[in-house]
């Protein structure tokens, strides 16, 4: 029975082997070549098993993050009516980036790039008492934007996966408390992902409102320019600055030190919306015989963009290097030959009992040279590889290879799992 429950490379849909492969500069191309995603048309990608596993790991962390805020999961329709977008004033304002279509009755609608209109109209029919507040609802789903020039693979596509959180509070003070709570939850989430990030002040743009922050990974491939103070760590997006000045004149508003700039990839954002949408869609509650318009916030994390951003930030000369928190598999168990598959199964079972069966993959593809398996492991970027060979049969010794550092540990089978649990995972 256990044999059929093991995660086996022999039955997984993995990328096809490439005999001689030079790691490309583009992390997006590496994701394609290694079988994480496959391009369908410009800006549109199919997710293969490895890519879907990374996406699901990110979503698992997001569900935990949202539950920590007391948020409830919902699912809003991909199609959104022209009427509610006209009501908010964004039907024309959004312009050509909006995918517009007609049904057979000539009703106009769009593929939603965001859901402020729909969620506000929906929640306005549900919220009828101050006692229900605060309300926090979120969804993880696909969004659509008709990009003129899709680029960067998953970094800027025409179809993408987002986590959206929408919040409703009775007044501005309560909404500001919610805003700070969400920023803290985002900090915790990005720390769980495991890469250095920067939170910056940002412009509100087409969404509206008067307060916004963004979360970024520093990387040359990014489209944003962020400015940071080396003294007090104040950070802001370039949109918030007067760039008509020379770089030496751009100083920190807090301590007056000179700001330094870097390119970055935006992976998350927060907006305080105030009453922009709630006033238009009658999201109100009665307080002391008076209807009070609710204060809203919206908060997003780009799931598909995060996959690409992490790939770009961590990629090295040998391939991808996934943080263990979102890796498709945290541990790969590799026998040195087909003769050692049974021993590898023993190590797999013991390891899976400690770190979880969904975190371990057994490299049991037969008639495939050990060197090719190890090269695949480097390219795909499994955080930890356990090599099982003749020394395990003779002495119970395995080797653990840490992908991010290249460190190798030779350990007996009794201490193997203690090290994995205590130091690695």
UniProtKB/Swiss-Prot annotation:
Gene Ontology molecular-function annotations: ATP binding; proline-tRNA ligase activity
GO biological process assignments: mitochondrial translation; prolyl-tRNA aminoacylation
Keywords, ordered alphabetically: Aminoacyl-tRNA synthetase, ATP-binding, Ligase, Mitochondrion, Nucleotide-binding, Protein biosynthesis, Transit peptide
Reaction equation(s) it catalyzes: tRNA(Pro) + L-proline + ATP = L-prolyl-tRNA(Pro) + AMP + diphosphate
One Pfam family per UniProt: HGTP_anticodon
UniProt keyword Metal-binding, yes or no: no
Domain of life: Eukaryota
Entry keyword annotation includes Ligase: yes
GO cellular component terms, A-Z: mitochondrial matrix; mitochondrion
Assigned EC number: 6.1.1.15
PROSITE patterns the record matches: AA_TRNA_LIGASE_II
Localization (cell): Mitochondrion
Homology family: Belongs to the class-II aminoacyl-tRNA synthetase family.
Name this protein carries in UniProt: Probable proline--tRNA ligase, mitochondrial
Organism: Schizosaccharomyces pombe (strain 972 / ATCC 24843) (Fission yeast)
Lineage summary: Eukaryota, Fungi, Dikarya, Ascomycota, Taphrinomycotina
